Amino acid sequence: MNETKYFEYNRKLWDERVESHKNSKFYNVKDFKAGKTSLNATELSEIGDINGKSILHLQCHFGMDTISFSRMGAKATGVDFSDDAIDLGRELTKDLKTDTCFISANIYDLKEQLDSRFDIVFTSYGTVGWLPDLTRWAEIVSHFLKDGGMFYMIDFHPVIWMYDNKSWDIKYSYFNSGAIREEVHGSYADRYHQNVAIEYGWNHSISEIINALINNGLQIKFLNEFPFSSYNVFQDMVQGKRGQWHFKSQGNNLPLMYSIKAVKR
């Protein structure tokens, strides 16, 4: 199967998720509209002050984080390949009277629709695992950064994607061995939603991610790994005193998230 077909399946999946995600407790749009940020303490502390800065948010879904950046004083642009998600993002920014910009595009094709450079490029929680080619991804990141601009990403650790979450047997390679096809029921935000869909993803090691960025002119400032998740998105998770999640059967033995900060040289 070619890349276009993979993206067609995944775009259909994400289009179908928009309505259930909008109404889910996970996204809690009601409290968001009332002023609550959708960003977590980890990324907020690592990104720092963004007031007055321009931010490009890649793979933004329906843009709650993007709008949160606008509320913090940034000039924020969100990009996603789901037309339905972008439509909802535009609806939210209109309702909330923020100046957030949204673009519907596959990030590999973004140069055809956007001719700007940004102080910050940001991506989070469900990013490179949806992309087959990290060299092209990192080139896009570098292209849209101003010289001296900052790239920041935070995501679920690739070690997690090796395991069968029920049996804890190793099911997939840590390294990119090609597209992984899965039949999914519901989603992380609405596990009881009735839709059944096919998705395609790719495992990428930390070294593959880091080297793709370095090879495209970015200097790594830090790589952090965390023994917790900001979200309850896997089975067998319990919440700790600080509101962070970890696997009940694994404790703090596995890295669940990582973050990277880099600067364009």
Regions of interest found by a model, annotated:
Residues E112-V121:
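A short acidic, Gly/Pro-enriched loop at the edge of an enzyme's catalytic core
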Residues T135-M150:
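A short glycine-rich, Lys/Arg-flanked "PGG" loop and its adjoining helix->strand segment in the class I
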Residues T123-Y125, I154:
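Residues lining the SAM
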Residues N216-L218, G243-R265:
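Core SAM-dependent methyltransferase catalytic element
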Residues M1-N51, M64, S68, M150-S187:
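Conserved class I S-adenosyl-L-methionine
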Residues S54-L110:
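Class I SAM-dependent methyltransferase SAM/SAH-binding core
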